[in-house]
């Protein structure tokens, strides 16, 4: 079942959490209720790392990561980077992103195999992301939207994309990633699904305003089932 979260009174929980198959990063001052909800769902199988990034609580916006690697902005402090290095699994490769773009989480949607990138990212940045995360990167837009990470979220099971996408663009997503996609919303009608959903291949969290119909769609497309 998808779990609802309310972080800092906001429903855009993807701004504040990075969840992968091997680690979870949350801000230092996350309240104990939300921390315990996340910890309970992770069931001690995934380490939770509490840190800010660039002195900001928006760790989900500022980081890009999966179980193989983590990319941090060039504005990260020495102390913050050391916190990550001390608590991340040893196999996770950490590299600094040197372009003057800090909202990395808005520019890329990815799982363990593929990354969908905003055309605003340079080729050298895409190559860095590909090397660190071990994914194939493809540049595209979602209709007229360039902020791929804001309007798309997917894992190894399937994905949600903003609902105003053409059939051709939808079919391209399926062909590129090899997973099913569905147009949908989160938080009672918001199309920024990449900000309202946090997931890995086994768990899905969503913003607290997400209604039952939206949760049903998210569960069906993003959660593992015996039929997939």
UniProtKB/Swiss-Prot annotation:
Its main location: cytoplasm. Keywords: Cytoplasm, Initiation factor, Nucleus, Protein biosynthesis, Ribosome biogenesis. Belongs to the eIF-6 family. GO terms for biological process: cytosolic ribosome assembly; ribosomal large subunit biogenesis. Signal peptide: none annotated. The keyword Transmembrane does not apply. Binds to the 60S ribosomal subunit and prevents its association with the 40S ribosomal subunit to form the 80S initiation complex in the cytoplasm. May also be involved in ribosome biogenesis. One of its GO terms (cellular component) is nucleolus. The gene is EIF6. InterPro entries: eIF6. GO terms for molecular function: ribosomal large subunit binding; translation initiation factor activity. It holds the Pfam family eIF-6. Monomer. Associates with the 60S ribosomal subunit. It is found in: Cytoplasm; Nucleus, Nucleolus. This is Eukaryotic translation initiation factor 6.
